[in-house]
Design a protein with these regions (language model features):
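Acidic-and-aromatic substrate-binding clefts and catalytic sites of carbohydrate-active enzymes
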Residues: 31-34, 63-71, 99-104, 133-134, ...
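CE4/NodB-like, metal-dependent polysaccharide N-deacetylase domain
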Residues: 106-126, 153-157
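Acidic (Asp/Glu)-rich catalytic clusters
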Residues: 14-15, 73-87, 114-120, 177-180, ...
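Glycine-rich phosphate-binding "P-loop"
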Residues: 24-40, 124, 129-141
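N-terminal binding-site loop/beta-alpha segment at the start of enzyme catalytic domains
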Residues: 1-90, 217-220, 322-343
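Short, acidic/polar
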Residues: 37-53, 102-116, 171-173
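A short, structured active-site edge motif that brings together acidic residues
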Residues: 86-100, 124-130, 190-191
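Beta/alpha (TIM)-barrel catalytic core signal, keyed to glycine-rich beta->alpha loops juxtaposed to Asp/Glu
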Residues: 8, 98, 129-343
Length: 343
């Protein structure tokens, strides 16, 4: 094998002074149409995580829900042993699921993640959602302010270097900031061309809370989108023309645009060439007029709508008029690892 292509990913400084790489590797494999967890891309993803670290990625985004913490832990251990990377060079994020929203359970969840990852601390732990429910899917109505107290506690204990949130709306963030000692460093949300989240980004910027985008391509990739999904697709002529000008792909243009907005992105892929492609966005700059053209694609279209949760307390999104449904079993309780045999 020849010299491996290397990517150089810059960092943003969080409100606690810690550096967080501007682009990370996202490790959520997703659910199948029947609501079960999708293991089909598992082996490819494990290979890609390893490859990503080899070529220069330092930021890995995972969660208890993703089931893959044990494998990530094995990869990290091997890369450190092989001298590819030092622990302090890595930025590892995990998340606490809404079934662990009590003050006692937050620490239980994080310690479980640390055990699976083989680490004594993560760089960031997030409250995955502002809601809370039992493993039977029953609303626990726990105030996220109480949950956040436990996040401040695990921070004090040194189990994590920073604490943040995910899927919180502006009102929830305002209330959290007003009633806590430690401000979240990040809010990780769905954000892409069609769903630009301007109000949320403006508020977070005013508070020095960094926005992190999961689903940075939204519904642009037809195979991953609902048939009636709105917003631009990969073959949009405007996007294709801008990509051609810079000799880049449309995905690179989208990721570059989000980077120029100051947003950290977590593109997910199980294709090695895309691992490199996604991070090869730091060698060119979109002009102001191109930036403005890309901003016009924002039609406030949310592609991820977990309507099965919309009657839970603290559900963060707008509600849709759909028949009531229950939380998929795969999001109530699970075992971890490829063989689903690790607590």
């Amino acid at each position: 094998m020849g010299t491996m292509a290397k990517v150089n990913i810059p960092s943003f400084t969080l409100n606690n002074g810690i550096q967080m790489p501007a682009l990370g590797y996202g490790t959520w494999l997703g659910l199948r149409p029947d609501g079960e967890f999708d293991y089909s891309g598992w082996d490819k993803m494990v290979d890609c995580i390893s490859y990503a670290i080899d070529v220069g990625y330092r930021h890995i985004d995972t969660a208890h829900l993703y089931r893959i913490e044990p494998e990530i832990g094995q990869i990290i251990k091997k890369k450190i042993q092989d001298g590819v990377v030092k622990r302090e060079d890595l930025f590892i994020t995990t998340k606490v699921w809404p079934t662990y929203a009590t003050e006692a359970d937050v620490e239980v969840s994080l310690r479980g993640s640390l055990r699976r990852l083989g680490l004594d601390h993560v760089d960031q732990v997030l409250a995955h959602w502002p809601m809370s429910y039992t493993e039977e899917g029953v609303d626990r109505k726990i105030d996220y302010l109480d949950t956040w107290q436990a996040f401040e506690t695990v921070l004090k204990k040194g189990l994590t270097r920073s604490i943040g949130v995910s899927n919180f709306n502006v009102e929830q963030l305002k209330r959290l900031v007003a009633n806590s000692n430690v401000k979240p460093v990040t809010n990780q949300v769905e954000l892409n061309l069609a769903f630009g989240q301007k109000e949320l980004v403006d508020y977070c910027t005013s508070q020095n809370i960094r926005v992190v985008a999961w689903a940075p391509f939204g519904a642009m990739i037809p195979s991953r989108a609902a048939p009636d999904a709105k917003g631009p697709k990969m073959d949009d002529p405007t996007l294709v023309a801008i990509a051609k000008k810079y000799n880049k792909s449309v995905t690179q243009i989208v990721l570059r645009y989000l980077y120029q907005r100051g947003i950290i992105t977590l593109p997910k892929t199980v294709t090695p060439s895309r691992v490199i492609e996604n991070a090869s966005i730091f060698d060119f700059e979109l002009s102001q007029s191109e930036f403005d053209i890309l901003a016009k694609f924002d039609i406030k279209y949310r592609s991820n709508r977990p309507t099965y949760w919309q009657n839970l307390s603290n559900y963060p999104f707008e509600k849709y008029d759909v028949p009531p449904s229950t939380t998929p079993k795969s999001m109530l309780s699970w075992k971890n690892g490829k063989n689903q045999d690790i607590d």
